[in-house]
Each structure stands twice: as structure tokens, then as C-alpha cells.
Amino acid sequence: MSVPTGTKSGFKNKEKPLEVRKSNILAARAVADAIRTSLGPKGMDKMIQTARGQVIISNDGNTILQHMAVMHPAAKMLVDLSASQDSVAGDGTTSVVILAGSLLGAADKLLKKGIHPSIIAENFQKAAQRAAEVVMDMSKPIDLSDRETLIRAASTSLNSKIVSQFSSTLAPMLVDAALQAAKKTPEGGLTLDLNDIRIIKSLGGTIEDTTLANGLVLNNYAVKNAGGPSRMEKAKIGLIQFQLSAPKPDMENHIVVNDYRQMDKILKEERQYILGLAKAIKKSKCNVLLIQKSILRDAVSELALHFLAKLNIMVIKDIERDDIEFISRSTGAKPVADIEAFTEDKLGSCDLVEEVESSGSKTVRFSSREGSNTVSILVRGANDLVIDETERSLHDALCVLRSLFRVPALVPGGGACEVQVAQVIGKESRAMDGASAICYEEFSNAMLVIPTTLAENAGLNPVNVVTELRVRHEKGEVNAGISVRRGTSIMVEEHVIQPALVTTSAITLAAECAKGLLRIDDIAFSR
């Protein structure tokens, strides 16, 4: 039982900060342990059931944590940490949480030795900066025009996912998509905006049937029930956000019809109104019309479809609001909210728009427009669970390529970087004295959690494998890492490589998170 001690300034509970830190460290390490089995090519998947009953199967750290019912504030910091790694590098979301948990475990040992938390936090921060330097010293600069190297980096990311058996098909496709969507920087490098690459999910077929298309692909179909076209060459594309149906009166108004002549008059007026809309669209030289989905009523009436078909205008309806921006970038069409503003200068263009049927589902494909760098990836799969996880896997691999475009340098995977960091930091700790030496030594030991976890998940003996790795690194084999087939091997020869940015950001962010948690000595709840 903690006893408050009386001082001039009042009563102070000396044990409370220790209990708060212990609680924070336990909660954070519990989160890290929960996803530890998901790391690496032999990592296990998690099945998550959301509050709405939706089932998700994934081994992506960020996805698992985002859906986990986490209550403790310190544990929520690790969820945010994974999200930060996802936004910075896109990959390494599991590694960063495991590293943070390991660093907090090391900090717990140091706290028990009586070292002040501020000293631990400061030394961990310095050690992380030194670790990032060690990783960059190990890195190998690459030429972004070297397609084979980019494919190997994308394959390494895909090999730990559900789509690993299809990585030889998907990796080249992703590299082609990234190079097509990339833009040149003033310095002569490349920059990749993932908003220029759209992943469309379509049920049916297998993952192997996933295809890449330059330009735009819509998971919709051309309306043909009124006899409209499903293929249009030299397309002039209009994008509307208003309804092609008769105007409705306000809720409080009503119309009283006394005889058939008045009814005929109303129907004739509606017919003339809709015909006027169709003629205005045709007058602008539009021959492909995209209509945004409406939650209020049908966005387009059967009569409007009939008139548009007679005018030989291809109609694609129920376009999602989220797709509007990508459609505008791909085709050059500007969204129009009123028929008065629907003019020729608002139209986009492309050489060909056609409806394509594959594996029992229909899509509409737009050929790439000159000057546009957008691409679409059509993901196929047997069920929604597979398709959703495939989409997440492709997104992670694209983020790896984006990281390479930002920092064009590769490092060996398989825990090679972490072992090298542990060796260098461990040596430097022996040249120090005082609390810094102990903190650096514990930091170096904490780094070994990644190779240890990889070995455990691959069914290897972690003690033997990590010891062998340390011996090989001591001999100068800095590229030696864990191979799930051979135990230890040279990672570059195994083509297990990843962007330097993924590793450096994981170590830096994990140390920052550990520092933030160590500096907390109380938890207060607001009213």
C-alpha cells in the first residue's frame, strides 16, 4: 500500500508515478505481443470481427490494430504509432509496434535499476539516431530506372502477405503501375502520388486474374436497357452531379388533378423537360455520360435513358462520389452540378470507352488520355475476404515503391539491419560509462526482437539462429539475415530487400513512442 508523504507543498504519493509507468508499459507490451506472431513471411493471419459483424482476415499490423478494441490510453499510442509508420513508409507497421514494445521492456529493466526515466528516454532517442545512421551506411543506392530491383523490393513486401504465391505476377504489375503514375521532380528524381493509382475490387476469378489498365476502369456497366451503346470511339465525356428526371415539388406542396387532360398535360411537360435536358447534353457534343449516384431518388429516369439512347449517348450511372476526383484526373472531365453549366469546355476525352466482361462481371474501361498518368488495377478474387486483403497487400507494396522513390536506397531484410544496429550500438556502449552505457546496451539488445520473432514465426530455434547471425555480422557479413528456408543466409542473394526508409522510420518512430510513454507519470481523466 502506498503511503502519502507530507511536504511543505502538500501531500505527494511517490509510488503513483511508478505504478502509472508500469501500467503503461504493460499495456503497450500487450499490444506488441498480440501482433508479434504476424511478422515475416511465415507470420500468421488474424481474423477480426467488427462491431457490425463484418469479418476481416489480415496480417497487416496497422489493419489489425485499427480494428482492435483497445481501451488503455498507452495502448492507443501504439495504434497511432502503427498508423504513423503506415503514412510515412506504408510498410513495417508490425515491426514498429514490436520494436516499441521491446524498447519499453528494456526501459522497464532500466527503471528497476533506478535509472531516471528522462535519462532512459534521452539515451534511447540518441541511440535511435545512431541506429538510423548505421542503417543508411548499410544501404545501397539504386537507380529508379532499374525495373528488376524495384520488382524484388515489391516482391519482398508481398511475400509476407496472403498473396505471396502470386508475387511473381503481381510485383511486375505494381512496378509498371508505379512507373506509369510517377512524376519527375525538378531535381531529376521521381515522386509517386498513390491517388493516381486506383485499386478496383471485382468479385470472381482468382488473384491471378488481377489486371493492370492504363487510364480509368469503373466497376459499373453501360446502361443498355433503353438500347444505348456500350462502346464509344473518340469519346467526349461528361460528368454530371444532377438528376436527369422530372423535377419534384417540395414536401409541403401537392398537385390536384381533376381529369385526364390535366394528367396528360403534366406528363407532356415532364417529357418536354427531360427531352430539353437530353438535347442540352447532346448540344455540348457529349457522347459518354457519367451520372453520380444519388441517395434521394433515381439519378436518371427511364424516359431520360430512352432519349439519351436515341441520341446515341453512352450512359454509365451510379458513379460513387469518392470516384469523382480520380475520373476528373483521368479523363479531364469537370463535374457539373447544373444543366446550365454543362458546356463543351467541361467535357473530358479519350480514344475509346467500352464495356468489358471478364469472369462473369462487367467493367467499363477508358483508354489512357495523353498527358494523364493515372492507372487502374482491377483486383479479382473468390470472395470479399480475399479481395480486401489483396487490396491491402497491393497498397503496402505500392507504399514500398513510393518509399524508394523518396529515398532511393535499399537495405537487406530478414532482420539483418537490426542485428547490425545491435552490434554497432553494443560496441559503442562498451566505450561509454555511467547510465548511458547501460541504456545503449539495453537498446542494442531490444533491437534483436525482430530477428528473434522472425526465427520463432518460421519455426526455427531463435537462440541458435540469432547467435549465428551475430557471429556472421562480427565477421563483417553485414547482409546476413534470417532465411525461412536455410536459417541464415545473405539477404541480397536471396533477393530479400526493402527500402531504407521503412527501417529507419520504424526505429526512429518506435524510440519516439517509447520516449513519450516513459515521460508520463500520471493519468488524469477529464470531466
UniProtKB/Swiss-Prot annotation:
Matches recorded under Gene3D superfamilies: GroEL (3.50.7.10), GroEL-like equatorial domain (1.10.560.10), TCP-1-like chaperonin intermediate domain (3.30.260.10)
GO cellular component: chaperonin-containing T-complex
Locations listed in the record: Cytoplasm
GO BP: chaperone mediated protein folding independent of cofactor; protein folding
Lineage: superkingdom: Eukaryota
Alphabetical list of PROSITE patterns matching this protein: TCP1_1, TCP1_2, TCP1_3
Stored InterPro entries: Chap_CCT_delta, Chaperone_TCP-1, Chaperonin_TCP-1_CS, Cpn60/GroEL/TCP-1, GroEL-like_apical_dom_sf, GROEL-like_equatorial_sf, TCP-1-like_intermed_sf, TCP-1_chaperonin
A GO term, aspect molecular function: ATP hydrolysis activity
A Pfam entry, by short name: Cpn60_TCP1
Main location: cytoplasm
Keywords: ATP-binding, Chaperone, Cytoplasm, Nucleotide-binding
Family: Belongs to the TCP-1 chaperonin family.
PANTHER family: CHAPERONIN
Function of the protein: Molecular chaperone; assists the folding of proteins upon ATP hydrolysis. Known to play a role, in vitro, in the folding of actin and tubulin.
Assembly behavior: Heterooligomeric complex of about 850 to 900 kDa that forms two stacked rings, 12 to 16 nm in diameter.
Name of the protein in question: T-complex protein 1 subunit delta
Species of origin: Yarrowia lipolytica (strain CLIB 122 / E 150)
Lineage, top ranks: Eukaryota, Fungi, Dikarya, Ascomycota, Saccharomycotina
